[in-house]
Amino acid sequence: MIPALQAATVDQRIEALMRTSELHKPEGEGPFPIVLQFHGCGGKKNLQERWAAVAKSAGWAALVVDSYGHRRISKFQAYATVCTGLQLWGRERAGDLFAMMEWARRQPWIDPNRIVIAGWSHGGWTALDAMSMTPGRQIENATRLYGLPEEPLAGLAGAFVIYPYQGIGALAPVNGLRIDVPVQAIVGTADSVVGGKSLVRVLNRMRTPSASIDVAIFEGATHAFDEIEAQDWRVRYDPALTERAHRMYAEFLTTAAKPSSAS
């Protein structure tokens, strides 16, 4: 069960998140497209920097968002409470995503029409929940975040989700996605944490405004196959599949989330 949420304004959430989030910015003045990266339930890890480097090499800025710093959730607490669903469900954490979208739109060096969200596991849950909720009362009730614009996801050009959790408590499988942008998902067939074939079925059935979610199936991939430092017995690092995923990330950013006619 989700504990009582602490209300905050968008400006308060932005300030809190930016204290411990990490920005990776290409050389030059821009304006640059940006990808907002949301970590898994274990917290911000080294793998996020490696993915951010891929984005930067493709000419994109990357903000590695830390959802735990301002909430004072330690690594132990994260595994004991967030990973088990006792606190910080995807719909609540979506407030961080909406706040960072607003932050990005305010930066003069960022292209406000080319913002991509990327999420790993719990971060994927967060991204898809954010894309499934209706602006106004539903979002405010879920996030307790106030002062959002009429369209909190204005400027969103795409979503890239890696082994996203879509089980009990996830809104997207029920609501479907509201925002019409390309969505790329990566699912491993040996993922015993969020599911392999079962997750593929959920994503393939998910209602979308137009094109279905593009689900890439990675044969033999476990959960967190891209984490070199993983110590979970359910996880096995696979360098070849990680390289494949990184290539897909760069291609998605440069192709699927291409410049709009308005930018």
Where would I find each of the regions flagged by the language model?
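Serine-hydrolase catalytic machinery in alpha/beta-hydrolase-like enzymes
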Residues: V10-K25, P31-I110, W125, F225-W233
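Glycine-rich His-Gly loop
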Residues: Q37-G42, P164, G188-T189
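Short alpha-helix in the alpha/beta-hydrolase fold that links the catalytic acid
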Residues: R50-W51, G195-R205
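Primarily recognizes the serine-hydrolase "nucleophile elbow" in alpha/beta-hydrolase
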Residues: W89-I179
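Acidic catalytic loop of the alpha/beta-hydrolase fold
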Residues: G167-I168, A190-V194
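Short beta-strand/loop motif that positions the catalytic acidic residue
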Residues: I179, A185-V187
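Acidic beta-to-alpha connecting loop that harbors the catalytic carboxylate
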Residues: T189-S192, G220-T222
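C-terminal catalytic histidine-bearing segment of alpha/beta-hydrolase fold enzymes
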Residues: A211-S263
